[in-house]
C-alpha cells in the first residue's frame, strides 16, 4: 500500500468513527432532553415480567393511604372518623371473608366516599394459583361488594405482596389495576 491509500483509509476510518460517536452522543442526549423516554427502558420490558402499579406520576407531590381489611373491624369506625376529621380519602382493600363478616362497615366505607379495593376472597398466595383460581379469588369479593354497595371495584392488592405474571394478566383481563 502506498501512502495515498493509507491516508484515504485513515480518513474513511475517522469519518465512520465520527458518525458512530455522534449517533451515541445524540442518543445519550435524548435521555436528558426528553426524560420521559427513560420510562420506556425499564426492567419489566427487558425481562418481559408483568408488574403491578407501584407509583403514579403526578403534577404535584401526593401520597395514597390504604388499609387492608382482612382480619377484624376493631379500628374501622375510628379510622373512618379520623379520615373524615382531616378530610382525607383512602382505599380499603377488603377480603371476601371480611366483606361477609362486616357488611355494615363495607357500606360505611363506601358511603364516606373512600375507594373500595379487592384483596382476594381468601387471602391466598396468589402466585401459587392457576389463572382460573386467581380469577375466582378476584371475582367473588367483587360481586359481594357490588351487591352491598352497587360499586364496581377496579383496584386489587395481592395478599402478602405476592404476584406473578399469571396474576397480573388475569387482573388486566378482568379490568382490574394490580397495585403494590
Q: Whereabouts are the PLM-identified features?
A:
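Acidic/histidine-rich helix-loop elements
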Residues: 35-38, 94-95, 126-131
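Catalytic domains of cell-wall/extracellular-matrix polysaccharide-remodeling enzymes
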Residues: 78, 124-180
Amino acid at each position: 500500500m502506498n501512502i495515498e491509500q493509507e491516508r484515504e483509509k485513515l480518513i474513511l476510518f475517522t469519518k465512520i468513527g465520527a458518525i458512530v460517536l455522534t449517533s451515541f452522543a445524540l442518543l445519550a442526549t435524548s435521555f436528558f432532553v426528553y426524560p420521559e423516554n427513560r420510562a420506556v427502558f425499564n426492567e419489566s420490558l427487558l425481562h418481559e415480567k408483568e408488574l403491578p402499579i407501584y407509583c403514579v406520576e403526578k403534577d404535584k407531590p401526593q401520597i395514597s393511604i390504604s388499609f387492608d381489611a382482612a382480619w377484624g373491624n376493631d379500628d374501622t369506625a375510628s379510622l373512618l372518623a379520623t379520615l373524615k376529621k382531616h378530610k382525607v380519602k383512602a382505599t380499603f382493600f377488603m377480603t371476601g371473608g371480611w366483606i361477609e363478616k362486616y357488611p355494615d362497615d363495607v357500606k360505611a366505607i363506601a358511603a364516606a366516599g373512600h375507594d373500595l379495593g379487592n384483596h382476594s376472597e381468601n387471602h391466598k398466595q396468589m402466585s401459587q394459583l392457576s389463572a382460573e383460581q386467581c380469577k375466582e379469588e378476584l371475582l367473588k369479593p367483587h360481586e359481594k361488594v357490588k351487591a352491598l354497595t352497587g360499586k364496581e371495584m377496579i383496584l386489587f392488592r395481592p395478599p402478602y405482596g405476592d404476584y406473578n405474571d399469571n396474576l397480573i394478566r388475569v387482573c388486566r383481563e378482568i379490568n382490574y389495576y394490580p397495585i403494590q
